[in-house]
Amino acid sequence: MKVLICARGYNSYSENKFGSFELDQAKALKAAGCDVRIASLDLRSVKSFRPHGAKLFRSNGMHCATVNSFSSILPQKISGSLGEKAAKAALKWICNDGWKPDVIHAHFTEIADAFAGALGNTDAKFVVTEHSSLMNTQNPDAKTLAQAKNAYLKADKVIAVSRALADNIRSSTGVQPEVVGNVVDTKVFEKLTTGSDSGYFKYVSCGNLVDVKRFDLLMTAFSMTDDKDARLTIFGDGVKKAELTHLCEKLGVKDRVIFKGHQPREVIAKEYAVSDVFVLASRAETFGVSFIEAMCCGLPVITSDCGGPQGFVNELNGVIVENCDAQKLAQAMNRMRLISRSYSSRRIHRFVEDNFSAQAIAKKLIDLYKSL
């Protein structure tokens, strides 16, 4: 089966990168025997300096075409036209040797909208996977909603990466997506946790230091927990770093909260393997890949009722804190400290392997393609 993945591109003079979710799916499908190519659009504004135009290259053993355009900040009519032209150019370049895809699979609203307008009279089935947090609401902004409706209308199948996102898409567009999650690299996160060997209980968290992740709530809850020797390690960086550092001092936990910044997956996986519990109390999560990566290492997790994780967190792998506030989160963290060893790290890891590994997601997608 020939599959064209339509992805977000992030390109400069020195490197070519794709959105990680799209690349992970492309690699999974290729490993499952599909003939996969990638057509990517870099539609960021001129502030993200890079060469304008098209480029052909190979990445991870796949033919790739990238077209750079500048349309993201423009009004819908103008940006839509530019995006469509960029998509047509990408399709022309990626198929310039006569290759014809059986399936064109676009990811994210803006990219899907651009390729929907560029399909022409192709016989290929058109599939859209929605990941965007902008659609994870019952009232998307007008531009995003228009792009989504245009793409979904032309799609043979719409996929959402979580049940919460699917419900919001149905509410705002009337389209009922099928749910297929993102791929998690189970090879990187394969070493199961042995728990902390440092003499104190270790909570760990991961996410961008931005408002929606509510690390201020997590730190406040951490300061309220019973065990004053426990540690909290946080991976990620962002605009709230200085504010959160100051909050640690104010709460009296600066010596027990460790900020690790952005780190490669391999570094994060090593920390998960010597931690006891993963905890993150986001306001909203479209999917929740950080939870899945932690679970892949066998860690039980604590989450707020934030959407995406509610589709996979259950009594066998963690706790969902309903109507989450600092007191309720602290109570959940206290309880988890007492019962964390009762969870089976192997069972938690197996759940991830069965549902979010490259093999599992590739099988779901190929079965879906064949059903169209």
Residue ranges and their predicted role:
Residues M1-H52, Q359, K370:
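N-terminal subdomain of nucleotide-sugar transferases
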Residues L4, G195-K213, M219-F222, T233:
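Conserved donor-binding/catalytic core segment of Leloir-type glycosyltransferases
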Residues E315-A326, R335-R341:
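Conserved acidic donor-binding segment of nucleotide-sugar-dependent glycosyltransferases
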